[in-house]
């Protein structure tokens, strides 16, 4: 599993305290659905996903994005046990939803882009490296139940 230094934990936690979960979550998930349109098949009950503007304005996309980032917030509180934190979600996404685990990496990368957009100069190379490590660790934890 991923090991975070005290400095990485501090950097991640500090920035996380400033994140608007609803806004950033909706934008990250929306970007995933726009940039990687094949991921839309997992969200067929979300209604209109016919264009970038429809996706980015879709209330179900925003709500699910918020839900995703709320789970990420739980992970940030438990950085030393990402696998345990995401055990249930890993099982759900593997056994019931059959989500390609590669999509977790893609969403993590979109989140890093969104954070960089929102935090600008505050999103230094050090901050980016810590967040890349965080989203990679989450992707590994979510993929854990896959065979």
Swiss-Prot record:
Described purpose of this protein according to its UniProt entry: Gamma chains make up the fetal hemoglobin F, in combination with alpha chains.
Tissue: Red blood cells.
Molecular functions (GO terms): haptoglobin binding; heme binding; hemoglobin alpha binding; metal ion binding; organic acid binding; oxygen binding; oxygen carrier activity; peroxidase activity
Transmembrane segments: none
Keyword list, A-Z: Heme, Iron, Metal-binding, Oxygen transport, Transport
Stored InterPro entries: Globin, Globin-like_sf, Globin/Proto, Hemoglobin_b, Hemoglobin_oxygen_transport
Family: Belongs to the globin family.
Source species taxonomy: Eukaryota, Metazoa, Chordata, Craniata, Vertebrata
GO BP terms: hydrogen peroxide catabolic process
Domain of life, source organism: Eukaryota
Amino acids binding heme b: 64, 93
Domain Globin residue range list: 3-147
Subunit: Heterotetramer of two alpha chains and two gamma chains in fetal hemoglobin (Hb F).
Protein name stated in the entry: Hemoglobin subunit gamma
Entry GO CC: blood microparticle; haptoglobin-hemoglobin complex; hemoglobin complex
């Amino acid at each position: 599993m991923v090991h975070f230094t005290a400095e990485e934990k501090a950097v991640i936690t500090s920035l996380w305290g400033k994140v608007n979960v609803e806004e950033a979550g909706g934008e990250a998930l929306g970007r995933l659905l726009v940039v990687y349109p094949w991921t839309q098949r997992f969200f067929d009950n979300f209604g209109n996903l016919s264009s970038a503007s429809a996706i980015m304005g879709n209330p179900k996309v925003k709500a699910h994005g918020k839900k995703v980032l709320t789970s990420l917030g739980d992970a940030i509180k438990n950085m030393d046990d990402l696998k345990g934190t995401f055990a249930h979600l890993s099982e759900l996404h593997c056994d019931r939803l059959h989500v390609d685990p590669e999509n977790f990496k893609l969403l993590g990368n979109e989140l890093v882009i969104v954070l960089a957009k929102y935090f600008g100069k505050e999103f230094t190379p050090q901050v980016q490296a810590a967040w890349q490590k965080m989203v990679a660790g989450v992707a590994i934890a979510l993929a854990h139940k896959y065979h």
